[in-house]
């Protein structure tokens, strides 16, 4: 039988099966398209795909480019309805097809951001193998510290300190792992489904009625801690050259080492850090704007019992595993602080050390470490294709040219504000790249004095790091949190993140502007 006949028979059987089940091809296609996403969402995505080519040939590439950015932001905002990769990816493919960008530009953006991709592939996976130790550490903190205000302070300050020596994305991955561990412990306890082979953490119908209110309170508690920790990573990440990917870029252009970067940024970064931590405390004291959720006693007891049981069951091999994790943690901080290699390569080293010395040698067990990060890595590459559109169509050029025309402190504040606004809607690595390259050109042309050039670099650094906490779009760590397996469990949607980040955004941005104006 020929290949043609085989294909024809398969097609006939499929069509016959559809006919027997009274499902038309069109209806089956609609059902399969974006899966279980709501019909209104599917309709909107199809409308976007139809609209873009029409706009391309009627109003031109510039307007269509801005419309595409808005459409892509919509897919991010609806992350809990449909993971942004399929829908956002369709928009990105169409952008290439209709000529808003090209495959070479997309590849170039990916090439420029290879350190970020390596970080996602290997550093996040490396943290997976440290999860046991990190959950143990943070669980001890949670069970020993009963004050929510103190917990908010600790999560914020620990996120800041860790991200100053690691990077914000890695620290966010740590906090996600910890929160997921907390949630899993109580959700499994509260489940009426005690056959754990059929237990599903994503469903609440198996939760005993008496625990429903405690579970909702616990979700609010974790949402609060996640936001305190995530904002903390942005606060600390702005202070050092390893904290954020764009910091490395700025430091390399300015020829700053670790100490130079910290000292130059300190007049703005330290006041913002202090005010950010104080904001966390104030939000919990006042129970304002969605904060103030407390840890229910039933949850605390379950977690304490789990900790005590695990402590009692831990043998010598278990303790040695924790020691190995602690040693690898020190190696990780030391390697990143001195920037001995690219972050992702250091992450691969950590994977090798932890798997070798803790006996994780099965491919299946190692593979689980990459499940969390790789979908987001693919999404980030799609995001870079949108960045390629921004670059190719010069969407930000008018704003950049206007800012460069200003002088003195006005220019510093304008740099901070323009970087901040653009970082809210775009990737802050891209924004920093564009502004630093344009500023470098102006400096090399003799249009900027060296002292002012240093200040402009700080304004770009703080502008891309501070207001960008407003939405998940600007900070890769925030987007990683939004699209993580934890977010739907604790009901942390796009708009909920925007809402919870708003007090931080306002206070930190005002502090950043004032520090840039009077202290820089």
Task: Give the predicted meaning of each segment.
Residues 139-148, 367, 403-406:
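Membrane interface segments of multi-pass transport proteins and intramembrane proteases
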Residues 28-29, 105, 132-146, 186-213, ...:
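Flexible loop linkers connecting adjacent transmembrane helices
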Residues 73-113, 159-202, 207-227, 245-267, ...:
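Membrane-interfacial helix-loop connectors
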Residues 484-507:
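Interfacial loop-to-transmembrane junctions
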């Amino acid at each position: 039988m020929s290949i043609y006949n085989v294909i024809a028979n398969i097609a006939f059987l499929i069509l016959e099966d559809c006919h027997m089940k009274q499902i038309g091809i069109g209806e089956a296609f609609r059902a399969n398209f974006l899966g279980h996403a709501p019909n209104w969402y599917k309709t909107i995505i199809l409308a976007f795909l139809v609209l873009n080519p029409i706009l391309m040939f009627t109003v031109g590439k510039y307007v269509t480019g801005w419309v595409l950015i808005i459409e892509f932001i919509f897919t991010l905002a609806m992350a809990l309805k449909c993971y942004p990769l399929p829908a956002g990816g369709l928009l990105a493919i169409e952008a290439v097809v209709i000529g808003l960008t090209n495959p070479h530009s997309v590849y170039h953006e990916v090439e420029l951001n290879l350190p970020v991709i390596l970080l996602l592939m290997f550093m996040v996976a490396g943290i997976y193998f440290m999860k046991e130790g990190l959950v143990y550490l943070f669980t001890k903190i949670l069970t020993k510290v009963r004050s929510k205000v103190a917990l908010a302070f600790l999560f914020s300050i620990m996120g800041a300190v860790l991200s100053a020596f690691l990077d914000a994305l890695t620290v966010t991955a740590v906090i996600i792992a910890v929160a997921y561990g907390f949630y899993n412990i109580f959700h499994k306890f509260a489940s009426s489904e005690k056959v754990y082979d059929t237990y599903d953490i994503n469903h609440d119908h198996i939760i005993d009625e008496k625990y429903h209110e405690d579970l909702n309170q616990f979700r609010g508690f974790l949402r609060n801690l996640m936001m305190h920790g995530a904002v903390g990573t942005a606060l600390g990440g702005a202070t050092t050259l390893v904290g954020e990917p764009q910091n490395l870029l700025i430091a390399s252009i300015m020829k700053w080492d670790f100490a130079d970067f910290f000292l130059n940024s300190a007049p703005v970064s330290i006041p913002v850090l202090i005010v950010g931590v104080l904001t966390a405390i104030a939000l919990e004291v006042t129970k304002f704007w969605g904060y103030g959720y407390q840890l229910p006693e039933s949850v605390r007891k379950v977690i304490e019992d789990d900790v005590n049981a695990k402590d009692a069951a831990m043998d010598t091999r278990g303790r040695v595993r924790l020691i190995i994790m602690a040693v690898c943690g020190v190696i990780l901080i030391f390697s990143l602080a001195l920037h001995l290699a690219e972050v992702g390569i250091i992450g691969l080293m950590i994977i090798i050390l932890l798997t070798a010395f803790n006996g994780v040698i099965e491919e299946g067990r190692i593979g689980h470490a990459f499940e969390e990060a790789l979908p987001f890595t693919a999404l980030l590459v799609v995001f870079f294709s949108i960045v390629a559109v921004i670059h190719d169509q010069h969407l930000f050029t008018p704003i950049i040219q206007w800012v460069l025309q200003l002088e003195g402190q006005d220019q510093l504040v304008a740099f901070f504000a323009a970087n901040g606004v653009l970082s809210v809607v775009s990737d802050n690595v891209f924004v920093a790249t564009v502004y630093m390259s344009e500023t470098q050109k102006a400096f090399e042309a003799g249009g900027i004095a060296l002292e002012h050039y240093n200040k402009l670099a700080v304004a770009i650094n703080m502008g891309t790091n501070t207001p960008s906490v407003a939405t998940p779009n600007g900070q890769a760590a925030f987007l990683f949190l939004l699209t993580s397996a934890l977010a739907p469990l604790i009901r942390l949607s796009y708009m909920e993140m925007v809402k919870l980040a708003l007090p931080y955004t306002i206070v930190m941005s005002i502090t950043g502007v004032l520090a840039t104006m009077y202290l820089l």
